[in-house]
Amino acid sequence: HSLNITVTNFKNTKGSLRVCITDQKNNFLKDCLFSQIVSIEDDNVSLSFENLKNGTYAVSVYHDENNNGILETSGLFGFPSEPFGFSKNPSVRFGPPSFKKSAIIVNDDKNITIKLN
């Protein structure tokens, strides 16, 4: 199956978009089953992952503005200083969402939109 992702709300076109798909709730935000690095040319970016098997997945993205491959954080609590987002666009206040809050079921071709925070 295909998972078509549109990421919105870019503030600039510096750097790149880094996308991670996982199917492991215990490794959410750590290990990517599939990943892509995409250049940013507009305030929206669209990309696709092909040949996904039926399953439950979560998608995390971040705008790597300085293109160093690391999600920059700041402050005492280490909140991301680069824009980020997750499938299902869960509320993010006191840390990243759980796998369950970001999980999507892929059993056919699917389109999702992720809004950067």
Where are these regions (language model features)?
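Short, ordered, surface-exposed loop/turn motifs in non-cytosolic proteins
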Residues: 12-26
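Extracellular beta-sheet/turn segments enriched in Thr/Pro/Gly and aliphatic residues
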Residues: 82-117
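Acidic, glycine-anchored loop motifs typical of Ca2+
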Residues: 65-72
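A glycine-anchored, Pro-Gly-centered beta-turn/N-cap motif
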Residues: 43, 48, 53-56
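Short proline/glycine- and polar residue-rich coil/turn motifs
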Residues: 38-43, 106
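A short tyrosine-centered beta-strand micro-motif
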Residues: 57-61
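A short, amphipathic beta-strand motif
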Residues: 3-10, 19
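Extracellular Ig-like/FN3 beta-sandwich strand-entry sites
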Residues: 14, 54-56, 109
